[in-house]
């Protein structure tokens, strides 16, 4: 069984700094069998903060430090080979799916326009660590 905590985090990236490189498992608890589903609500490009990934990073180990907004564990830049970075541009409704160990972040939004995305987390129904109290849950049986 798989569930999604229907806490669609509405990622609003207005004029802002970039999102540091990170792996979701550095701040997720419980079962590592989770997936993030990122749904673009408008066109995403380099100017408005497109996401970026390092292919194969889920098979590597990275040193984490506490850095950035919210004190979420993020990666030290020197641990990352930026030449391997793949920037993802997306259209409205495009979906990006990644596992908890995939290294990712986003570019700085310098467009002057806001960028929105909905982020869902899918996880085993036995894992209550990522559930948010008071929010509906979707379950596939």
What would you call each of these model-derived segments?
Residues 1-7, 29-32:
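Signature of the catalytic double-stranded beta-helix
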Residues 1-5, 50-53, 97:
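A structural signal for short, well-ordered beta-strand segments and their strand-loop junctions
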Residues 4-17:
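Short, compositionally biased segments
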Residues 5-8, 56, 100-102:
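Short, well-ordered beta-to-alpha junction loops that form the rim of enzyme active sites
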Residues 6, 37-39, 118-122:
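A structural signal for short, well-ordered beta-strand segments
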Residues 15-87, 127-136:
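Catalytic core of non-heme Fe(II) oxygenases with the double-stranded beta-helix
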Residues 50, 64-71, 92-97, 101-141:
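Non-heme Fe(II)/2-oxoglutarate
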């Amino acid at each position: 069984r798989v569930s999604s905590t229907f806490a669609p985090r509405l990622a609003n990236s207005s004029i802002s700094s970039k999102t540091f490189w990170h792996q979701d498992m550095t701040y997720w608890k419980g079962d590592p069998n989770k997936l993030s589903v990122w749904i673009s609500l408008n066109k995403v490009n380099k100017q408005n903060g497109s996401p970026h990934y390092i292919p194969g990073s889920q098979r590597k180990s990275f040193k984490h430090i506490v850095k950035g907004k919210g004190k979420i564990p993020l990666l030290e830049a020197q641990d990352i080979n930026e030449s391997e970075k793949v920037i993802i541009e997306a259209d409205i409704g495009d979906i990006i799916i990644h596992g908890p160990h995939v290294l990712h972040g986003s570019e700085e939004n310098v467009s002057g326009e806001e960028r929105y995305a909905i982020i869902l987390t899918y996880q085993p129904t036995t894992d209550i660590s990522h559930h948010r109290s008071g929010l509906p849950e979707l379950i596939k049986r």
